[in-house]
């Protein structure tokens, strides 16, 4: 864990806009983000895994490594994830390219990306990719630090999504709220 924190801090100092967090996500937030996942969840895709806090929680819930695919841009995070999670597929590619690399039968997309701080066209490309790879009843899980949903109302409406807002996770720096989105 100390290695994860050291890596996180090093990458934050080198590229704060890409890391876009002041601390790694807590284990409590990771459990909240992965609630409902298990051995029968099917394929799971994670966008922006960083040091792998959510990845660790996904696997702890019983998702098989061969059913988990990660998309991470940072070269050092990718090397760390590949070493730490053998059997998990790790792509050093943007989340928008998931459509070309993953089938359209994914049960859950877990996102650690800072969607609200991204340019609109990037955010929309990521959301489009997520819902193109999700199975019809698949869900997109995203957290936010703020008081509003991590997807703007126009995207929720355009994608025809239902929204499930979870409780605030106070045991995270800063506190975060988990949202689950599905097509209606």
Residues covered by each model-derived region:
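Class I SAM-dependent methyltransferase Rossmann-like catalytic core
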Residues: 3-37
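Conserved class I S-adenosyl-L-methionine
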Residues: 41-50
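Conserved SAM-binding loop of SAM-dependent methyltransferases across substrates and taxa
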Residues: 51-63
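Conserved SAM/SAH-binding beta-strand->alpha-helix loop
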Residues: 74-76
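Conserved SAM-binding strand-loop segment of SAM-dependent methyltransferases
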Residues: 87-96
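A short acidic, Gly/Pro-enriched loop at the edge of an enzyme's catalytic core
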Residues: 99-109
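A short glycine-rich, Lys/Arg-flanked "PGG" loop and its adjoining helix->strand segment in the class I
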Residues: 124-136
């Amino acid at each position: 864990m100390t290695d994860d924190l050291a890596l996180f801090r090093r990458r934050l100092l080198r590229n704060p806009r890409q890391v876009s967090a002041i601390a790694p996500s807590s284990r409590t937030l990771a459990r909240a983000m992965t609630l409902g996942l298990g051995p029968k969840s099917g394929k799971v895709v994670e966008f922006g895994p960083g040091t792998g806090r959510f990845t660790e929680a996904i696997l702890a819930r019983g998702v098989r490594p061969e059913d988990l695919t990660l998309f991470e841009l940072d070269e050092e995070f990718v090397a760390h994830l590949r070493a730490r999670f053998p059997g998990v597929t790790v792509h050093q590619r943007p989340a928008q390219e998931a459509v070309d690399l993953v089938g359209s039968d994914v049960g859950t997309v877990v996102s650690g990306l800072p969607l609200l701080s991204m340019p609109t066209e990037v955010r929309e490309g990521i959301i489009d990719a997520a819902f193109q790879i999700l199975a019809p009843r698949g869900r997109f899980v995203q957290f936010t630090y703020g008081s509003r949903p991590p997807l703007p109302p126009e995207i929720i409406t355009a994608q025809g999504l239902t929204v499930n807002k979870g409780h605030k996770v106070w045991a995270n720096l800063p506190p975060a709220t988990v949202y689950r989105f599905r097509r209606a």
